[in-house]
Amino acid sequence: MTELIKKGSAAKEAAQFLAQATTKQKNTALLNLSNDLLAHTSTLLKENEKDILRAQKKGTPETMIDRLRLTEDRMKEISEAVKQVVALKDPIGEVTNMWKNEAELTIGKTRVPLGVIGIIYESRPNVTVDASVLCFKTGNAVILRGGSDAIDSNKALMSVIQDSLEASGFPRSSVQLIEDTSRETARDMMRLNRFLDVLIPRGGARLIQTVLENATVPVIETGTGNCHIYVDKAAEKQMAIDILVNAKCSRPSVCNAAETLLIHRDVAEDYLPAMETALKEYDVELRADERAKEILQEAKAAKESDWEDEFLDFILAVKVVDSAEEAIEHINKYGTKHSEAIISNDYATGQAFHQKVDAAAVYINASTRFTDGFAMGFGAEIGISTQKLHARGPMGLTELTSTKYIIFGDGQIRN
């Protein structure tokens, strides 16, 4: 708890400094950081290798190790991502609305930082940089608590970030890492209302549920991604295959990857064998309901838990449905309100799907893999929010701000 209080207090002070920083000052610091990350790539990769070796000894699945791994190419991507944040418009100070009331007061609504943001996340060291940069750009101080699997990578990255920001004239406490990765410290952080204005968990279902059950700090839930592809009877066969393979296989360990295929009974016998062939190239394990299992050559019988799980692996649950309505009911029952897709050339069915499915992102004839800040065209994101307050969907710079009312008068008093 001592580490949390010390760093929480320092973050509060840093937040006041950051709130006054100009866009030019912040962008200059971020450009310097981008260069410093590249300059320290060799050291960072050596520290990352410690985490990789430890994970391999534990028997961690390769798909999860991939999330942990840093390479020269990934460091270049991380460095470039920092530059892309520099290019984004700074929302701080933006006047979103202005008007006069009956008392002739001029009332303005402007964007301000949230203050101090806490982020608890798992084994993805790139998040250490992404979160630091996004919070910094929006004038927020941030306290990070990464998973134990990535502790050496995170400590090395944090050292580079803090040294770089300090050299640019900013407090080291603008961005801080909790090095104690124990569950007790994580739970203490969830109750750090005295210093944290908001807490954002990024990770699997267990982590997020733990935060929701224990936090007294306001939470923005970045949910798990039990994403579905529904292939309608009016779907184009090759389009359905291409989208399914991309959504499942391009990067199965991320939250916008597809986990369940729902397919209309009228096209199941024709489409499923071709889909199985395409997925076989990636050694995807299929877990099917009774009707789908009769059509597929190699599939395990699906359990109830398979409809609920976020596999984050080359595993796909498959179910044959009688109608689009049944698909929608299934998604709303088992989905995590993240990203859902329908493949159909029937306009009315597509409209019904997007109106009735409860999710942050609903796709018609496109892969769920586009639920991403960069892919959607508004830059880096802190996570994908699956709740409806304070933000929903990919959380970019604007979602890391609050608003303040500025009222100008010339002596008015209220009667």
UniProtKB/Swiss-Prot annotation:
Reaction(s) catalysed by this chain's protein: L-glutamate 5-semialdehyde + phosphate + NADP(+) = L-glutamyl 5-phosphate + NADPH + H(+)
GO biological process: L-proline biosynthetic process
Primary localisation category: cytoplasm
PROSITE patterns listed in its UniProt record: PROA
Pathway: Amino-acid biosynthesis; L-proline biosynthesis; L-glutamate 5-semialdehyde from L-glutamate: step 2/2
Keyword Transmembrane helix: no
Location in or out of the cell: Cytoplasm
Pfam families per record: Aldedh (PF00171)
E.C. designation(s): 1.2.1.41
InterPro entries named among the record's database cross-references: Ald_DH/histidinol_DH (IPR016161), Ald_DH_C (IPR016163), Ald_DH_N (IPR016162), Aldehyde_DH_dom (IPR015590), G-glutamylP_reductase_CS (IPR020593), Glu-5-SA_DH (IPR012134), GPR_dom (IPR000965)
Record flagged with keyword Ribonucleoprotein: no
Main EC class the enzyme belongs to: oxidoreductase
UniProt keyword annotations, A-Z: Amino-acid biosynthesis, Cytoplasm, NADP, Oxidoreductase, Proline biosynthesis
Cellular component annotations (GO), alphabetically ordered: cytoplasm
GO molecular-function terms, A-Z: glutamate-5-semialdehyde dehydrogenase activity; NADP binding
Family, per entry: Belongs to the gamma-glutamyl phosphate reductase family.
Protein role: Catalyzes the NADPH-dependent reduction of L-glutamate 5-phosphate into L-glutamate 5-semialdehyde and phosphate. The product spontaneously undergoes cyclization to form 1-pyrroline-5-carboxylate.
Name of the protein in its database record: Gamma-glutamyl phosphate reductase
Classification lineage: Bacteria, Bacillati, Bacillota, Bacilli, Bacillales
Gene that encodes it: proA
